[in-house]
Amino acid sequence: VTAAPAATAATAATPATAALNFAATAATPATPATPALIFAATAATAATPATAALNFAATAATPATAATPALIFAAAAATAATPATAALNFAATAATPATAATPALIFAATAATAATPATPAFHFAATAATPATAATPALIFAATAATAATPATPAFHFAATAATPATAATPALIFAATAATAATPATAALNFAATAATPATAATPALIFAATAATAATPATAALNFAATAATAATPATAACNFAATAATPATAATPALIFAATAATAATPATAACNFAATAATPATAATPALIFAATAATAATPATAALNFAATAATPATAATPALIFAATAATAATPATAALNFAATAATPATAATPALIFAATAATAATPATAALNFAATAATAATPATPAFNFAATAATPATAATPALIFAATAATAATPATAALNFAATAATPATAATPALIFAATAATAATPATAALHFAATAATAATPATAALNFAATAATPATAATPALIFAATAATAATPATAAFNFAATAATAATPATAALNFAATAATPATAATPALIFAATAATAATPATAALNFAATAATPATAATPALIFAATAATAATPATPAFHFAATAATPATAATPALIFAATAATAATPATAALNFAATAATAATPATAALNFAATAATPATAATPALIFAATAATAATPATAALNFAATAATPATAATPALIFAATAATAATPATAAFNFAATAATAATPATAATPALIFAATAATAATPATPATPALIFAATAATAATPATPALNFAATAATAATTAARG
């Protein structure tokens, strides 16, 4: 099987080729089976002690656990036979002759060979820690430079597990991590929360999404992405938290406009913790208090650095029993099971009493002996107590609804204690609303949920897309990340964050959707309250793809209802093939040429605001060589005849005007548009402006191989696209597996029907040619790209 989904141009001539996406392990001859773990990749070779730029969940494979699990969200591949092969693209497979079915790895890839020492230009976690580039680890989303003292130090990303000899089988948890034991105090260099600040490597943790590396020696060092603080004595107020920004002082003009967090509270500025999405008020006593992102644990004296949990840390101290600073899940481990609940977006601290505890995914239960089924669910759980039966204690908005603190929800990433006094106080964070008797129908929607009431026609404070388009307000696309619940009384009200608006009494089926569900009632046919995908399949459209991470619920009644969720486009009869793009979708209809109220970066490119590019997370304007080429996902351009420059790209719109040629203040990638191609390449999180001059250009983001002159338009991968070559016409359904690729080895040829995994989709066969509105895994099987191979 060709490794089409990867398209890697790693030749000996281009040593830096391996711009691996979401992980890359420098498979050395010594460790042929190195787990190119997804959401975790380890590449620590003896030669490069700091090499362990683990991505999203590295596991320090000890000799005891040789059979490292080809983890989902991970996959092992690199064999000695194909040293540089795996330039995997969010799902690439380094198909070697020995392992034909090598796991079409998702979110990771292994490649670096001894021949190319600087190879791992890892994306979202790469560290080229060579002696020559000491300051290398500009790690993204993780990366800790293991010190000589702890060569195998689990600088886990999104779930490091401090594998101690006692727990050899320690779960290499993903999206969660278990705190290191007293034996390894600084071990937990967890990403999304921890800092492995050891005396030896003071500036080490260039942690992303949480990590402060403020050392006196390197004042401006931590230009961390998504969470860095360069808190030096010279810049006391430097905590330029994004999503919580701090007033830049004249002394530090270039203060890191940190994204999604960063606090560096120095003694001079005790309250500076303008933390993003989970800040902790630094007290004078703890000047360097962990500017934890998406979680923060108050390490107790007994376990100094222990609970550096990622995405679920709980500083369960006996003094603060109710402490649940739960993030995306997090169970407050009880005294009986001190380190147990290192839940991974689902982990369950299965105590002897509850052996069968549901190892919920995207929902975790912190089953303690006292409360066996306590459902502190992640991403959807409701802690329905007898007192409050419908109390959506959603994670991403979990509320520890105790009788004493009914309104408790100091929810992280969501939570509003809507009291009767402030009925419309929808300060929802990522969704939740503590429904009070007064507002019974408050849909504590998660990642979606719109509840446009008749009273407030424009109230559509949509979350990431959803629009509860009622017949009265057809074009109500008041997108979130820009949503405004403009009511006469509280015009600026909705300080909505990734959140949602509560549905009205008219729709009793209060779509408390969790990442998908839509309670499509007959009364509201177009109620596309899609949650990260779900489509309310009406009788008329029985086969509607209930896509995950993308879904279109367009009914004939509301043709322009494009309440896309993270992309979905309501395919109208006129545009049957409209790409229900994920993370990028344009619903530009002829009637509303400027319609694209894009989420996460929409730019209303009007003649008046030519330089508008509020680029987010990427955006590159391709050169004249490939004018209309990359209509990549994560950045679709809805260029209609009426608005040729309408590229209101999602997650990366660029309004490249001749005046601002170098415009793209690109984030997470983006190549600067040239004057020749005004709005063209709205690349998706990985667009590469493959010009003959910059053949090696790979500004790869989340995927994207730098198309060389030989294959100009080739690798337009979508989070896991597989370029099904003509060689395998029989496998049209090539598993563009997403978030779970199965590595069917030659040993098990009996499992050809690779699971059409969730968070993935297999490209439909010839019977349904246009079918694959694949989510997070579009297969680019075109006849033109037969040569597309890894």
Curated annotation (Swiss-Prot):
Propeptide: 1-5
UniProt keyword terms in alphabetical order: Antifreeze protein, Glycoprotein, Repeat, Secreted
Primary location recorded for the protein, binned into one broad class: secreted
Location(s) in or outside the cell: Secreted
Transmembrane segments: none
Processing after translation: O-glycosylated; contains disaccharide galactose-N-acetylgalactosamine attached to threonines in AFGP8 and AFGP7.
GO cellular component, one term: extracellular region
Tissue expression remark: Synthesized by the liver and secreted into the blood from which they become distributed to almost the entire extracellular space.
Comment field on protein domains: Contains 44 copies of AFGP8 and two copies of AFGP7.
Physiological role: Antifreeze proteins lower the blood freezing point.
Protein name: Ice-structuring glycoprotein
